[in-house]
Curated annotation (Swiss-Prot):
This is Dual specificity protein kinase shkC. It comes from the Eukaryota. It is found in: Membrane. It comes from Dictyostelium discoideum. The gene is shkC. Belongs to the protein kinase superfamily. TKL Ser/Thr protein kinase family. SH2 domain-containing protein kinase subfamily. Its EC number is 2.7.11.1. Residues 396-488 form the SH2 domain. Residues 1-21 are annotated as: Disordered. Keywords: ATP-binding, Kinase, Membrane, Nucleotide-binding, Serine/threonine-protein kinase, Transferase, Tyrosine-protein kinase. Required for proper chemotaxis and phagocytosis; proper spatiotemporal control of F-actin levels in chemotaxing cells. Negative regulator of the PI3K (phosphatidylinositol 3 kinase) pathway. Predominantly phosphorylates serines and threonines and tyrosines at a lower level. GO terms for cellular component: cytoplasm; membrane. It catalyses: L-seryl-[protein] + ATP = O-phospho-L-seryl-[protein] + ADP + H(+); L-threonyl-[protein] + ATP = O-phospho-L-threonyl-[protein] + ADP + H(+).
Length: 506
């Protein structure tokens, strides 16, 4: 529907971001806050978000302050801050126009348990938010957001997070303090104790709020959900120093960060620069469970979550004390090791135009280590690459395959035919898919018990041993026979001897 705001506007403009009322078309309502309603809309042929302010009867001083805020907001540019595109500052018609962030706010995503959000992804989202807030805090003058909460973190189509809603933001010079005079501004559940107690505060109040958000991102629960009365809540947080309970299985690095952020002493809280650095470690811990794998990634790519294959393999060879790729003979085991690891780990970059053919993603690296780990201590003579090569050399190993594709490859094969693949539901586990009596396909899990493998309640030292010892056969099933392994020609081709003088390393 049309905004209905009329077409008259003053000739004097407040600056480049001023938008005429007739340029804005309102569509459906997508959110409501204390200062206004947010609509999906269109402006100058672009899909946008339009915030219609509840309060429109501005006096001259308030209108001047609003226009000043609009002017300041127009100068904030950062990938993790919702892009301010303009505003109408005409009295009675005040709206703010921003980019439209399609997946809504983080609060809604977190509390919808049907949506899968792995811890690694959630911690990456937390880092995005920290990057945006850090940009505000490092500005001059300093922006103190004052209302950091999960509903003010928007999520785009790539699951990247952007800070929004600067309605309560305060500007201050560095090293200066702020103080509320009449009422504490912000959302009580996320509000720092010093703000609730009308004490002086600074940007560290945003750090406290972020600590509560970080707990919410971790647990996917509402903070302080048992509190109902504001006064009792204020006493619990400000006097008794109550904080939400951190789960026992929380990563140690994440626990330490949360506790630092919501410290009762503002001066003890970290800056957002320090928070970002801590989250770099947390993200690696969340993506990689193998301790040596974590050590490798932190020493090699601490701030990166995706790296070019060449940079990755050079770093891994150096860390594991294996021969460098440019020193390997094409017929050597070391060269074959590199080819095999690339076959299961490297993938095309998600972003176009990078100029890089293949990359390694930290999350996939962590999963591969769960399948082939643990990673041995760095030493000449054996590395994780040897383990990968040994498994890929078995004709029956098919790697990353879902149930449907596994059944397709076994269709029409003799009874007893089988293949082994990664489990599609349990990281670190494998699945044996086999043709049984009647020609149907049966899928059975091989679980990990430390470095050993459990198949049908029998413990084996390796996948290869399960096959070589003719594992299985319980409950009338067919025992495994290596002769009936269905070949995976993709992996088998890696083991062809290279003779061409002109062949270059791939």
């Amino acid at each position: 529907m049309d905004s209905g705001l009329g077409s008259s506007y003053p000739e004097e403009r407040s600056g480049p971001p001023e938008i005429r009322p007739e340029e804005i078309n309102f569509e459906e309502l997508i959110g409501t806050g204390s200062f206004g309603k947010v609509y999906k809309g269109r402006c100058r042929q672009k899909a946008v978000a339009v915030k219609l302010l509840h309060k429109q009867n501005f006096d001259a001083a308030t209108l001047s302050a609003f226009r000043k805020e609009v002017h300041l907001m127009s100068k904030i540019y950062h990938p993790n801050i919702c892009l301010f595109m303009g505003a109408c500052t005409i009295p009675g018609r005040c709206v703010i126009v921003t980019e439209l962030v399609p997946k809504g706010n983080l609060e809604t995503l977190l509390h919808d348990q049907k949506i899968q959000l792995p811890l690694y992804l959630r911690m990456r989202m937390a880092r995005d938010a920290a990057l945006g807030i850090n940009w505000l805090h490092e500005s001059n003058p300093v922006f103190v957001h004052r209302d950091i909460k999960s509903s003010n973190l928007l999520v785009d189509e790539n699951m990247r997070v952007k800070i929004c809603d600067f309605g309560l933001s305060a500007l201050k010079q560095k090293h200066k303090m702020l103080k509320d005079q009449s009422s504490a501004k912000g959302t009580p559940l996320y509000m720092a104790p010093e703000v609730m107690m009308f004490k002086e505060f600074n940007e560290s109040s945003d750090v406290y709020s972020f600590g509560i958000v970080l707990w919410e991102i971790l647990t996917r629960k509402e903070p302080f959900s048992h509190h109902r009365e504001l006064e009792k809540f204020r006493e619990a947080v400000c006097v008794k120093h109550e904080r939400p309970p951190i789960p026992n299985d929380c990563l140690d690095s994440l626990r330490r960060l949360i506790e630092k952020c919501w410290d009762k002493e503002p001066i003890s809280r970290p800056s957002f620069k320090e928070i970002i650095s801590a989250l770099d470690h947390v993200i690696i811990d969340a993506a990689i469970s193998d301790l040596n794998g974590r050590d490798f990634w932190k020493k090699s790519f601490l701030t990166e979550q995706e790296v070019p294959w060449e940079a990755f393999i050079d770093a891994l060879c150096n860390w594991s004390k294996a021969p460098a790729r440019n020193q390997c003979d094409k017929t050597s085991i070391d060269y074959l090791n590199i080819k095999c690891l690339k076959a299961v780990l490297a993938e095309s970059p998600k972003s176009e135009g990078t100029g890089v053919e293949t990359v390694v993603n930290i999350e996939k690296f962590g999963k591969i280590l769960e399948f082939f780990g643990p990673v041995p201590e760095p030493a000449p003579g054996h590395s994780i690459m040897d383990t990968v090569r040994e498994i890929l050399s078995q004709k029956w190993f098919h790697g990353d395959l879902d149930t449907t594709e596994a059944a397709s490859r076994l269709n029409g094969q003799p009874i007893g035919s089988f293949l082994i693949r990664f489990s599609s539901t349990n990281a670190g586990c494998f699945t044996i898919s086999q043709v049984v009596d009647g020609g149907s396909i049966k899928h059975q899990r091989v679980s990990r018990q430390g470095v050993k493998f459990n198949y049908q309640n029998v413990i084996y030292n390796s996948l290869i041993e399960i096959v070589s010892k003719n594992g299985g056969g319980a409950n009338g099933d067919v025992k495994l026979d290596s002769q009936l392994g269905v070949p995976n020609y993709k992996f088998m081709s890696l083991f062809c001897v290279l003779n061409k003088e002109s062949e270059v390393y791939q």
